[in-house]
């Protein structure tokens, strides 16, 4: 079978449409620059040599590789073509002359057009700019307001700048700034004023995070909002976050960067950032700003660039809507200002890919504040119109209220509508108490009721569910509910807000509370109408998703629509249109292949079996396989020693047969190779002809379309002619009736019969003329039909490819084109004839009218000859009408035939496409080996990446082992220190037991303490088994020192001092206990203070609740508020302040006690050090000491 596949592949390779160079120079004449060419029929027809060179070397191009490619040149014909290397900005094109000189733009010079001429500067896409010194000396422009150099002697201002010197802002703008691409900043003023100027009351203020002490309130989150670890580097004074997965992690800014940042508009946000490892490809979501329901984002770098690895770089972003700031989506001016007014989130991407780490430092947001200092001229001061006040016209003036409270400072201010012309609350519009008309008493309505505007003394319940308050719109007297729950809107809170669905009142079915639409994050959060507000069906799915909840992929796409990363959601099916079912792929992206195709994308021909043309090859290969198996059997017998001398003879014979068969196969292959080359040439020729036929068929199709259009025009004109003839017939009938009823008196009106006869003859002549025109039109239609049929027949012959040579094909095509041109001319002639017939018919109609007028003037004429002549004219008109009807039918048949011919032409075109598809299948088989090699390369790359990851993990493990080793060594060092301390404790314990054996009761306490120390040391020895030997040595040392009691007199005093210190320790212990007791008491007092504070806060909440109640406030309510405030102040002064003073005093005393304890501990440590020095100075050995007392 392997040999069979090899034969198949060999056959496919021999069919490739390229001709290898042969010894005949007339085949591939490529000037030594290529060894491949292909036959081109059109080139052969034009030049007589039909071979076109392929894959020209040495940067050459042309039919015979005779010239250099675009952007290359050479000094002589046989030289290599060298690159021009023309500068992309300074040259007019990529080409150059034979010397390598590029064509330069104005003001540019150099062989490569890469530098400016003297007197010019700044090379740009438009060339070099002339120096200012070369310009008009009167050109005096403000550099902050011009958009470019003053080349023409006049200043070219930025869009928001005006003035002869570009030194003034246009009306509605302020603050001329050189860094502003618009020149000046538009007045904001919340949209209430277009007049403003720079404020002198604000100074520059920078909101920064330098991370010198800690993370400064920053956090780290994943894309889905889950928290991530954020680390602070004490060494580098920055923060960083790492990720093991590809999902990105973001730095989240603290509250000081959020909130109302209006004064930062037009200023910069900058930070230092670096990334280690990872993908390092910037994305559109690197920096994200959110606020007021809007979101904008920007990449760290331009698309196509890569973030530097391990290098800290400062990134700066301008906070405005100008396209140069690279924020997307691009907001309007007021949308951007609205976002900055309520900035709710600032996120900076930290990681890029797996095992990525991002570092951030020196975050700076340029802002301003109303204090003295360096001026901030970008802050505006508005000139407010009537009804507004404040620096930014953000407040309503006295006597005005907010028209729409939900818009906040963006809402318009309108006059108060209080009875008596009184003032009102600027935000709610409620009239102040005492400002109403004193003659009318208004009822004080509770929550859930409102004043009837027609009867202010009565209260009506609000038409709101759940007892929500309401108010009356002054203009329309409409009752509107206030404070609807989240997700609910409408005048009666009866509708779900945008982004929510349900039916709060059950007006269209069962009651369903409003809930957020579940579209699986597959809609644009900034868009409106993402889902149906009643059913919740998602209407604007993005990321190629579909379904009720955007939880499915659209037809022709696959992937996970619920993936958090948009790049991992639905992707287009990458299926071969030739080998796959249209518009279908499976959930894993694999395509549904047609029969005979395979592979993930159905782009590989399925190699289940060879085509039918290889059956003979398969039979021959089966025979060779059988012979090979018999040879193997003979060899096995020969190796086994069986069969005597007969086997070698048979083996040799079979080998000779095999060699002969191989020679035959080789000869056949060589013959087949020549045949295959001829087939390849013919295939290339057939492809070229196929392209020509396809082009000509397209021309025929266009011609048929034009003929159809002309036919429609002719049909319309024939219908017009028929209509005119009908009108003529009616006119003639009327004339005949008049003639029949006319009596002519010879004495009054005598008209000779010759006059009527001449009129009748003229009418007859006109009718004959129309008949001839109709016959001519019919003949033209028949000729058009014949020519179209001939063209269709010839097209069929051409596409079938049978029955003639290339020259015959060429002649046939030329004949077909001639017929086509003749058909076009006939169509034009037909159009002219139809137009002429139309004109003639109209003339006849007008003449008939004149005849009718003449006849109407004849009163009482009774001439039988006139009646006969009129009947003859009518018959002539009837025959003309019948002829026109037949002509119309003929045109209809031609039009129908044109439709059929178009259908047949389309079928022929589809046949050509099918043949082209067969050729593409052969090419796809030839590319199979290449695809397999690419797959092997991909597998090799994957293996390399896996090995690299393993190496990285091993290195990290090595570092961890080194860290653990260092910790173990440190623990071993501490172990020796602990052992030494245990030995010292045991030594001192033995000394205390020997020296204080007959001490007084005061020293007994020290002995007990030493015993306890011995017990502690014994427990430590049990825990550390390796210290038993040292404990024994310590015991031996204690026995040796027992014999030198005389030398311990001085040490006795030290031990007494130690006992005294222990007594002090006990005293300090009591002091500590006292401190603990006092701390507990302080905690109790703090708890009591907390209760008091909570009571005070409850009182304040109650006061604020009373203040927030709608409606007017009477004097009694004001007195209750004042009493509540007085009680709260009294409670704070009488209870909280003494408690705070007492707590501060106790904290001071505790600090003093701690200081005393630290001093005592230092003294004890010094005594221990002194004892250690005494012990070290004692001489070793045994001594015969005297008893302390003589008996």
Swiss-Prot record:
Motif extent (Cell attachment site): 586-588
InterPro entries: EGF-like_dom, Laminin/Netrin_ECM, Laminin_IV, LE_dom
Outcome of substituting residue 202 to A: No fibulin-1C binding. No change to fibulin-2 binding
Stretches the record annotates as Domain II and I: 603-1191
Effect of residue 206 to A: No fibulin-1C binding. No change to fibulin-2 binding
One record GO biological process: cell adhesion
Known glycosylation sites: 342, 362, 526, 805, 941, 1032
Laminin IV type A domain ranges (all copies): 213-381
Statement: the UniProt record of this protein carries the keyword Cytoplasm: no
Effect of residue 76 to A: No change to herarin-binding
Domain Laminin EGF-like: 28-83, 84-130, 139-186, 187-196, 382-415, 416-461, 462-516, 517-572, 573-602
Residues in coiled coil: 612-710, 759-786, 946-996, 1139-1178
CDD domains xrefs: EGF_Lam
Impact after mutating residue 78 to A: No change to herarin-binding
Post-translational modification summary for this protein: O-glycosylated; contains chondroitin sulfate (CS).
One GO cellular component, as annotated: basement membrane
Annotated signal peptide: 1-21
Effect the entry attributes to changing residue 442 to S: 20-fold reduction to fibulin-2 binding
Membrane-crossing segments per the record: none
Compartments in which it is found: Secreted, Extracellular space, Extracellular matrix, Basement membrane
UniProt function note: Binding to cells via a high affinity receptor, laminin is thought to mediate the attachment, migration and organization of cells into tissues during embryonic development by interacting with other extracellular matrix components.
Record remark on domains: The alpha-helical domains I and II are thought to interact with other laminin chains to form a coiled coil structure. Domain IV is globular.
Note: Binds heparin.
Subunit structure: Laminin is a complex glycoprotein, consisting of three different polypeptide chains (alpha, beta, gamma), which are bound to each other by disulfide bonds into a cross-shaped molecule comprising one long and three short arms with globules at each end. Gamma-2 is a subunit of laminin-5 (laminin-332 or epiligrin/kalinin/nicein). Binds to fibulin-1, fibulin-1c, fibulin-2 and nidogen.
Protein's name according to its UniProt entry: Laminin subunit gamma-2
Organism: Mus musculus (Mouse)
Gene: Lamc2
């Amino acid at each position: 079978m392997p040999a069979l596949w090899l034969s198949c592949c060999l056959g496919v390779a021999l069919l490739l449409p390229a001709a290898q160079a042969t010894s005949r120079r007339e085949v591939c004449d490529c000037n030594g620059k290529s060894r491949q060419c292909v036959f081109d029929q059109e080139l052969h027809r034009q030049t007589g040599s039909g071979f076109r060179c392929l894959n020209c070397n040495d940067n050459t191009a042309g039919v015979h590789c005779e010239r250099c490619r675009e952007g290359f040149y050479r000094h002589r014909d046989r030289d290599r073509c060298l690159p021009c290397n023309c500068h992309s900005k300074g040259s007019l094109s990529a080409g150059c002359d034979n010397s390598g000189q590029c064509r330069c733009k104005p003001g540019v010079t150099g062989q490569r057009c890469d530098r400016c001429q003297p007197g010019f500067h700044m090379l740009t896409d438009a060339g070099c700019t002339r120096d200012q010194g070369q310009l008009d000396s009167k050109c005096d422009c403000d550099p902050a307001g011009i958009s470019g150099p003053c080349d023409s002697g006049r200043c070219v201002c930025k869009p928001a700048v005006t003035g002869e010197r570009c030194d003034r802002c246009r009306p509605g703008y302020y603050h001329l700034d050189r860094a502003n691409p618009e020149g000046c900043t538009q007045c904001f003023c919340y949209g209430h004023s277009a007049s403003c100027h720079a404020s002198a009351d604000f100074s520059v203020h920078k909101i920064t995070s330098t991370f010198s002490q800690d993370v400064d309130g920053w956090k780290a989150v994943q894309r889905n909002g889950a928290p991530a670890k954020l680390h602070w580097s004490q060494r580098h004074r920055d923060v960083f976050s790492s990720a093991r997965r590809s999902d990105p992690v973001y730095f989240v800014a603290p509250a000081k960067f959020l909130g109302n940042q209006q004064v930062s508009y037009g200023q910069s946000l900058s930070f230092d950032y670096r990334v280690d490892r990872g993908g390092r490809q910037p994305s559109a979501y690197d920096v994200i700003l959110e606020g007021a329901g809007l979101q904008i984002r920007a990449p760290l770098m331009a698309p196509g660039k890569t973030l530097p690895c391990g290098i800290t770089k400062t990134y700066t972003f301008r906070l405005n809507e100008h396209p140069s700031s690279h924020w997307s989506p691009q907001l309007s001016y007021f949308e951007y200002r609205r976002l900055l007014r309520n900035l709710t989130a600032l996120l900076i991407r930290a990681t890029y890919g797996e095992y990525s780490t991002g570092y951030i430092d020196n975050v700076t947001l340029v802002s301003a504040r109303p204090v003295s200092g360096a001026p901030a001229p970008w802050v505006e001061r508005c000139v407010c119109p009537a009804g507004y006040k404040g620096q930014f016209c953000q407040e309503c003036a006295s006597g005005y209220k907010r028209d729409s409270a939900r818009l906040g400072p963006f809402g318009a201010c309108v006059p108060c509508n209080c009875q008596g012309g009184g003032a009102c609350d600027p935000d709610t519009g409620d009239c102040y108490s005492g400002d109403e008309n004193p003659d009318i008493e208004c009822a004080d309505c509770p929550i859930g009721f409102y004043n009837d505007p027609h009867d202010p003394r009565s209260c009506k319940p609000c038409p709101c569910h759940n007892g929500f308050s309401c108010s009356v719109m002054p203009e329309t007297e409409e009752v509107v509910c206030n404070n609807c729950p989240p997700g609910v809107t409408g005048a009666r809170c009866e509708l779900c807000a945008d982004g929510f669905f349900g039916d709060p009142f059950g007006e269209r079915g069962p009651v369903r509370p409003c809930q957020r639409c579940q579209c699986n994050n597959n809609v644009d959060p900034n868009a409106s109408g993402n889902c149906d507000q009643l059913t919740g069906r998602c209407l604007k799915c993005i990321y190629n998703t579909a379904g009720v909840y955007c939880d499915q992929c659209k037809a022709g796409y696959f992937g996970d629509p619920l993936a958090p990363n948009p790049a991992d959601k639905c992707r287009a099916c990458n299926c071969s249109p030739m080998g796959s079912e249209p518009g279908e792929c499976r959930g894993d992206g694999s395509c549904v292949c047609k029969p005979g195709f395979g592979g993930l994308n159905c782009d590989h021909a399925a190699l289940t079996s060879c085509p039918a043309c290889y059956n003979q090859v398969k039979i021959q290969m089966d025979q060779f396989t059988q012979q090979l198996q018999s040879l193997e059997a003979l060899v096995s017998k020969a190796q086994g020693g069986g069969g005597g001398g007969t086997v070698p003879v048979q083996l040799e014979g079979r080998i000779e047969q095999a060699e002969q068969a191989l020679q035959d196969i080789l000869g056949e292959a060589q013959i087949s190779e020549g045949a295959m080359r001829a087939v390849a040439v013919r295939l290339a020729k057939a492809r070229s002809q196929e392209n020509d036929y396809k082009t000509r068929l397209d021309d025929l199709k266009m011609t048929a379309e034009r003929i159809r259009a002309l036919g429609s025009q002719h049909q319309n004109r024939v219908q017009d002619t028929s209509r005119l003839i009908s009108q003529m017939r009616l006119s003639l009938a009327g004339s005949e009736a008049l003639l029949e009823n006319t009596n002519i008196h010879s004495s009054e009106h005598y008209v000779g019969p010759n006059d009527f006869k001449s009129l009748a003859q003229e009418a007859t002549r006109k009718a004959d003329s129309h008949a001839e025109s109709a016959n001519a039109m019919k003949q033209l239609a028949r000729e058009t039909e014949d020519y179209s049929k001939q063209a269709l027949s010839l097209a069929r012959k051409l596409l079938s490819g049978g029955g003639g040579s290339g020259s015959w094909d060429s002649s046939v095509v030329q004949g077909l084109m001639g017929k086509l041109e003749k058909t076009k001319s006939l169509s034009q002639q037909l159009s002219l004839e139809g137009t002429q017939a139309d004109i003639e018919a109209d003339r006849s109609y007008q003449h008939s009218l004149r005849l009718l007028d003449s006849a109407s003037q004849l009163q009482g004429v009774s001439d039988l000859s006139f009646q006969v002549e009129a009947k003859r004219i009518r018959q002539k008109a009837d025959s003309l009408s019948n002829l026109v009807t037949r002509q119309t039918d003929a045109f209809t048949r031609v039009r129908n035939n044109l439709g059929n011919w178009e259908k047949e032409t389309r079928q022929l075109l589809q046949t050509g496409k099918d043949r082209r598809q067969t050729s593409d299948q052969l090419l796809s088989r030839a590319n199979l080996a290449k695809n397999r090699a690419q797959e092997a390369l991909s597998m090799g790359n994957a293996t390399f990446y896996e090995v690299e990851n393993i190496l990285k993990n091993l290195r990290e493990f090595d570092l961890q082992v080194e860290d653990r080793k260092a910790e173990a060594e440190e623990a071993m060092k501490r172990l020796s220190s602990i052992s030494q301390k245990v030995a010292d404790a045991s030594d001192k314990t033995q000394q205390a037991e020997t020296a204080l054996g007959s001490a007084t009761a005061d020293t007994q306490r020290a002995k007990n303490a030493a015993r306890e120390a011995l017990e502690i040391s014994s427990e430590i020895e049990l825990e550390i088994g390796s210290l038993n030997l040292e404990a024994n040595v310590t015991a031996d040392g204690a026995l040796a020192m027992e014999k030198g009691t005389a030398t311990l007199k001085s040490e006795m005093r030290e031990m007494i001092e130690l006992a005294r210190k222990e007594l002090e320790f006990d005293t300090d212990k009591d002091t500590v206990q006292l401190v603990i007791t006092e701390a507990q008491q302080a905690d109790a007092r703090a708890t009591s203070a907390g209760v008091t504070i909570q009571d005070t806060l409850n009182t304040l909440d109650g006061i604020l609740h009373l203040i927030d109640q709608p409606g007017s406030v009477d004097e009694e309510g004001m007195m209750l508020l004042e009493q509540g405030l007085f009680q709260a102040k009294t409670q704070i002064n009488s209870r909280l302040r003494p408690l705070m003073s007492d707590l501060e005093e106790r904290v001071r005393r505790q600090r003093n006690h701690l200081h005393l304890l630290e001093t005592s501990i230092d003294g004890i440590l010094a005594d221990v050090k002194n004892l250690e020095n005494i012990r070290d100075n004692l001489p070793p050995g045994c001594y015969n000491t005297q008893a302390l007392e003589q008996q």
